């Protein structure tokens, strides 16, 4: 029985494919669901990479169940962000809503995809309430338990 329990989470992760990220909701958005599919960005060489050798991905989001942004506070739009795993760099990918959309390109080695309610759809700096988030496949082996945010210490 113990072996079966260990296999189930791995099977659940693989069901989405190696380049799909299941986005997790928050207590403030219990009905929100989403996936982010990472698709290699266009390149004449077949695979797009940065000068440092990091893969470049276009992010395609499929979202449902997001409430109106105003239900979370003084917000008017949802914006998708690509975020480094240390939470120091937030790169705006674009405005999103329920449905499917390709929002932008991310080229971090390990990263998070975050959908947040923001005061404006053109927001260039994250300041709003997080509605959905997920970790890139390259970040699955990293633990965030040691990050100050999760230990109750301000970064």
Which residue ranges define each predicted feature?
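N-terminal targeting/export leaders
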Residues: 5, 13-155
């Amino acid at each position: 029985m113990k072996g079966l329990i260990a296999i189930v989470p791995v099977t659940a992760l693989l069901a989405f494919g190696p380049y799909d990220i299941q986005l997790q909701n928050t207590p403030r958005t219990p009905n929100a669901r989403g996936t982010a599919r990472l698709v290699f960005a266009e390149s004449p060489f077949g695979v797009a990479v940065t000068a440092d050798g990091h893969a470049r991905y276009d992010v395609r989001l499929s979202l449902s169940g997001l409430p109106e942004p105003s239900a979370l506070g003084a917000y008017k739009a949802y914006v998708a962000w690509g975020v480094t795993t240390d939470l120091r760099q937030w790169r705006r990918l674009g405005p999103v809503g329920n449905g499917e959309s390709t929002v932008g390109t991310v080229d971090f080695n390990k990263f998070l995809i975050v959908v947040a309610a923001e005061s404006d759809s053109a927001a260039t700096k994250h300041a709003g309430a997080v509605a959905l988030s997920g970790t890139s496949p390259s970040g699955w082996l990293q633990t965030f338990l040691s990050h100050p945010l999760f230990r109750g210490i301000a970064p």
